[in-house]
UniProtKB/Swiss-Prot annotation:
The keyword Iron applies. This is Probable Fe(2+)-trafficking protein. One of its GO terms (biological process) is cellular response to oxidative stress. Belongs to the Fe(2+)-trafficking protein family. GO terms for molecular function: iron ion binding. It comes from the Bacteria. Pfam families: Iron_traffic. InterPro entries: Fe_traffick_prot_YggX (IPR007457), Fe_traffick_prot_YggX_sf (IPR036766). Could be a mediator in iron transactions between iron acquisition and iron-requiring processes, such as synthesis and/or repair of Fe-S clusters in biosynthetic enzymes.
Length: 90
């Protein structure tokens, strides 16, 4: 049976993650309050941010930026795409 959480992103009960997806306090907070579906939404958002800003995840500044965006995505005002972002509809 799946673990259920009240997802802060979806504002509904949903299947929870199997384990904390990120180290430390933020990872535990996400594990306790974010659903699998919302985590999948974040992975798509993170991929877009990495591609649009040409980030290297191994770079400490990029990791710090992505961590702030992740916290905003789930617990703040959300994570906005870059100003000139236009999704490819092809």
């Amino acid at each position: 049976m799946s673990r259920k959480v009240h997802c802060v992103k979806l504002q509904q009960e949903a299947d929870g993650l199997d384990r904390p997806p990120y180290p430390g306090e933020l990872g535990q907070r996400i594990y306790d309050n974010v659903s699998k579906q919302a985590w999948s939404m974040w992975v798509q958002q993170q991929t877009m941010l990495i591609n649009e800003y040409r980030l290297t995840p191994a770079d400490p500044k990029a990791r710090s930026f992505l961590e702030r965006e992740m916290e905003n995505f789930f617990f703040g005002q959300g994570s906005a795409p870059p100003p000139d972002f236009s999704p490819d509809h092809s």
